[in-house]
UniProtKB/Swiss-Prot annotation:
Disulfide bonds: none annotated. Residues 199-214 have a biased composition (Polar residues). One of its GO terms (cellular component) is nucleus. This is Transcription factor FUP7. It comes from Fusarium proliferatum (strain ET1) (Orchid endophyte fungus).
Length: 245
């Protein structure tokens, strides 16, 4: 990324009356000479030419219209209605929006020029001028309100689309992860599965089985043990003492 390039020259180049390339934070000349590169403070631009006079003229016209209306109506209730809660809220809201737009130097300058053009096209010198101005302001307010509503509707529509898309993806994922044959009658047969094998016996340790031919009654078993015990040869005592330990 190339360094930022400014319009004004640095203080060092300006004091030496030399050409400055305007590269920030340090220009090429200051870097080559090993000098500290400092820059002048950028001042905010003032209002465009003629804005102050146009603003003063517009303010005078507005005050004159207000005075004429009050003298023509001579209605105390009109002042009360003009300063009720709803009217003051709308006026303060509009004033706050305009004041916020004028805070930025660049946007404020364009806005000031637009206001000067608006004041020139809609003066407040006659009753017809005031009616036209009121109609223009009302139309602009309605267009701004419709634009805000359309923007809000578009945002809500996008949120609904994203929400429905997320639900559809979640449902599709559940369908993919679920087994294909959840029911018993819809299960697909396993070619390696023997239907004669009980599935409950899977995982249980094998049971010890004996053949029928090897099984003997308990009485015969005791008899064989007695015969084996009785058939032992009794050795003499001298032989036991000599050869047995």
């Amino acid at each position: 990324m190339s360094p930022a390039r400014g319009r004004a020259a640095c203080k060092t180049c300006r004091s030496r009356k030399q050409k400055c390339d305007g590269i920030r934070p340090a220009c090429s000349r200051c870097r080559s000479l090993g000098l500290q590169c400092t820059w002048p403070t950028v001042l905010k631009r003032g209002p465009p030419k003629g804005y102050t006079k146009a603003l003063e003229a517009r303010l005078a016209e507005t005050e004159l219209v207000l005075i004429r209306l009050l003298h023509a109506t001579n209605d105390e209730g009109l002042l009360a209605r003009a300063f009720d809660g709803d009217t003051q809220k709308r006026a303060h809201k509009r004033f706050g929006e305009r004041n916020t737009e004028l805070k930025s130097s660049v946007i404020g300058e364009h806005k000031m020029l637009a206001l000067m053009d608006h004041w020139e096209r809609f003066p407040l010198r006659t009753a017809d001028d005031v009616r036209q101005w009121i109609g223009e302001v009302s139309k602009t307010s309605m267009m701004q309100g419709e634009g805000t509503n359309q923007s809000n509707e578009k945002t809500r529509g996008l949120l609904r689309v994203e929400s429905s898309s997320g639900n559809a993806d979640y449902q599709h994922e559940d369908e993919v992860q679920s087994p294909a044959g959840a029911g018993d009658d819809m299960a697909v047969g396993d070619p390696y599965r023997d239907d004669s094998v009980d599935q409950d016996s899977i995982g249980q340790p094998p049971q010890r089985t004996e053949s029928v031919g090897n099984m003997q009654p308990a009485c015969e078993t005791h008899a064989v043990q007695d015969i084996t015990t009785s058939s032992r040869i009794e050795l003499p005592a001298d032989f036991k003492d000599q050869f047995l330990w």
